[in-house]
């Protein structure tokens, strides 16, 4: 999984994300072998999002990706859960 996470981080950087966070069961460590990969993406330009998703889908894995682009006005409880359980895979240097 570590190699997959490195590839996801590289894609996030390539597509202009400010931050990529793994959340959900894989971040908590209570996942099953076939659990999807939940990703929260911060600050990615809208024009890059579809290509990011397609590039993730092209990675050599049978796992499914659930990609959420974080925007203003999202459910604060959802955002708090990401903050509580999330594992940062990539953060842009300021």
Describe each model-derived feature in a short phrase.
Residues 1-19, 27-33, 42-94:
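Catalytic core of pol beta-like nucleotidyltransferases
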């Amino acid at each position: 999984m570590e190699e997959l996470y490195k590839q996801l981080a590289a894609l996030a950087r390539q597509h202009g994300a400010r931050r990529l966070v793994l959340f959900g069961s894989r971040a908590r460590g209570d996942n099953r072998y076939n659990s999807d990969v939940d990703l929260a993406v911060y600050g990615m330009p809208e024009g890059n999002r579809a290509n990011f998703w397609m590039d993730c889908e092209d990675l050599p894995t049978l796992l499914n990706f659930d990609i959420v682009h974080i925007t203003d006005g999202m459910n604060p409880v959802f955002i708090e859960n990401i903050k509580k359980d999330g594992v940062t895979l990539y953060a842009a240097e300021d």
